[in-house]
Amino acid sequence: MLKLLLLALPLFSLMHRSPLCQEWGIVGGQEAPGNKWPWQVSLRANETYWRHFCGGSLIHPQWVLTAAHCVGPTIADPNKVRVQLRKQYLYYHDHLLAVSRIITHPTFYATQNGADIALLELKNPVNISSHVHPVSLPPASETFPSGTLCWVTGWGNIDNDVSLPPPFPLKEVQVPVVENQLCDLKYHKGVYTGDNIHIVRDDMLCAGNEGHDSCQGDSGGPLVCKVNGTWLQAGVVSWGEGCALPNRPGIYTRVTYYLDWIHRYVPKDF
């Protein structure tokens, strides 16, 4: 069986683990400028302190988009989760927001089977400013063709088994979109499975190359691409094998595939 690697830091015992292993954060990138990525959020779990475990994106003043494997497959207690809006450095003057509801996609049970997407409803809407505001969702017709240069952001590890060091700055890396069929072929290299078995599914999007990728702790965070002058969220950090390895692009949940589901809960206008 393909050894798949989760991108989330260990969190709830309810997280689906087998047959999955951990993966690792932003590789090959740099610290993000303080005025960029105003939709980036950090999800926190209450341990000895409110610890970062996944990323997410603000898509509405009261809604956060993230990966289902961060909080599922069963619905986690929202009282055990907090959201920190865009911060340059983790744990520096935190202002954590309460969550009223966590909604995982009903067909999710493991990352490699797709539907790795979830919504968090905040108890109160946030105040929108130049520093904090939602990212735009793409139109259903947007395909993000192969070679499109996009950006992924997060506070995850900076290499395999290498944690992001203090002061834990938000990192960014530019990654090219890889066409699904090519990505699937890449993932079949060195894997003993039939060519008729699709590892990369239609609801997934691939991006990254050797030396440039997302990693552990980045799960749930946004992959964004600038289209006609507007930043659109193309994907949600989901899974991969290793970190920035040859023939192993990062795999993201394709946002356009789940627009109808998202808008069952999240208003289109605000």
UniProtKB/Swiss-Prot annotation:
GO molecular function per UniProt: serine-type endopeptidase activity
Enzyme class: hydrolase
EC number from the UniProt entry: 3.4.21.59
Active site: 69, 116, 219
Pfam families named among the record's database cross-references: Trypsin
Entry annotated with the keyword Signal: yes
GO BP field: proteolysis
Signal peptide coordinates: 1-25
Reaction equations catalysed: Preferential cleavage: Arg-|-Xaa, Lys-|-Xaa, but with more restricted specificity than trypsin
Peptidase S1 domain mapped to chain residues: 26-267
Coiled-coil spans in chain: none
Keywords: Disulfide bond, Glycoprotein, Hydrolase, Protease, Serine protease, Signal
InterPro entries, alphabetized: Peptidase_S1_PA (IPR009003), Peptidase_S1_PA_chymotrypsin (IPR043504), Peptidase_S1A (IPR001314), Trypsin_dom (IPR001254), TRYPSIN_HIS (IPR018114), TRYPSIN_SER (IPR033116)
Known glycosylation sites: 46, 127, 228
Disulfide-bond pairs as recorded: 54-70, 150-225, 183-206, 215-243
Protein family: Belongs to the peptidase S1 family. Tryptase subfamily.
Matches recorded under PANTHER family: CHYMOTRYPSIN-LIKE PROTEASE CTRL-1-RELATED, TRANSMEMBRANE PROTEASE SERINE
Protein name: Mast cell tryptase
